A protein has these predicted regions:
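Catalytic grooves of carbohydrate-active enzymes
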Residues: 1-55
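Extended hydrophobic/aromatic segments used for targeting, binding, or gating
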Residues: 35-83
Length: 147
C-alpha cells in the first residue's frame, strides 16, 4: 500500500510500535522495518520526505488552519502555528525574471531557485509545467510571498 500511495503523490505514513520493533528482544521487527525503509529510499528517495509523527502533526495543522489568500502576484498567509519546510504550489504561474520574495515583519528574503522539485528545501522555489512551487519556514502569524 505504501508504494501505491507514494506513486500517486499522496501522503504515506508508517506507524511502528516499540514492542513490535523489538519482538521480545530479538529486534526482528526493527530489522524488517529497516529493510522497508531502505527499499523505499532506493526506489522513491527523490520523492520521499521522512518526518516524525510530531512533525507531520505540526505540518498538517498549519496546512489546515493557515488562512491563505491570493491577490495579484501575492500570497498572504495568516498562520496560527508555524511549520518548517512549508510548501505552496501556485498553479498556472510561470517563472518570472525576479525570484519570489518571502516577507515577514517587513523583512524580505529572496527565495533561491532550484532546477528540480526534488531539490526544494526551505528558502527555495521551482517553476515547472504545473506552476510555481515555493518552500519556506512558515512562521506563526502573518507573512507574504510576492513574485
Amino acid at each position: 500500500r505504501m508504494v501505491e500511495l507514494i506513486k500517486r503523490g499522496e501522503p504515506a505514513v508508517m506507524l511502528c510500535h516499540w514492542p513490535g520493533m523489538y519482538t521480545q528482544g530479538t529486534k526482528k521487527g526493527f530489522t524488517a522495518f529497516k529493510r522497508v525503509v531502505e527499499t523505499l529510499n532506493s526506489r522513491f528517495g527523490d520523492q520521499t520526505i521522512w518526518m516524525k509523527l510530531s512533525e507531520i502533526g505540526r505540518y498538517w495543522t498549519a496546512k489546515e488552519l493557515t488562512r491563505i489568500t491570493f491577490a495579484d502576484r501575492k500570497i498572504s498567509l495568516n498562520a496560527p502555528f508555524g511549520a518548517p519546510k512549508f510548501t505552496v504550489r501556485v498553479p498556472g504561474v510561470v517563472a518570472t525574471n525576479s525570484p519570489p520574495r518571502f516577507i515577514v515583519e517587513n523583512q524580505t528574503v529572496a527565495l533561491q531557485g532550484v532546477t528540480e522539485t526534488r531539490l526544494l528545501r526551505s528558502g527555495t522555489w521551482h517553476a515547472d509545467s504545473k506552476g510555481l512551487v515555493m518552500c519556506f519556514d512558515l512562521p506563526k502569524g502573518v507573512s507574504q510571498i510576492q513574485w
